[in-house]
Amino acid sequence: MAFLLGCEKVRVDFPTKEVFSEVSLGVDEGDRVGIVGRNGDGKSTLLNLLAGTLEPDEGRVLRNGAVRVGVLGQADSLDPAATVGQAVVGDLPEYEWAGDARIRDIIAGLAGDIPWDAQVGTLSGGQRRRVDLVRLLIGDWDVLALDEPTNHLDVRAITWLADHLK
């Protein structure tokens, strides 16, 4: 399997503490990696480091060429004034995304019961999480970095997501 991304002997410091040090990790094509630990142990920091949104204080992050990393953070960055449709597909014409069975299946699986023209700011936390997941999952990524992806999800959505990620 081909190497996609990783890190070697990285250290990350915050102003009041060392988050972690001497961490090394490699992710190959087809890998499924779970990062577990207590609150505040640096799981989100490690994901951000691997995704390229944070630089280490020491060590190095490795990427195979232009590997595309899709990131789902703990909190969404959806525009509350946008409609669900705008948040999910942006300005992409309907004939482009609606003609793709994969995209239609993801929308139906996670957001089929959410009105397409509803404003994101009017949605519940679980609905917002599902919209953010749809936005991410319809993308074309080499690596998905999901930070607590089941937060705010009901059992049906968790089951759908687990089946989809198999």
Each model region followed by its residue ranges:
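ABC ATP-binding cassette signature C-motif
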Residues: 1-166
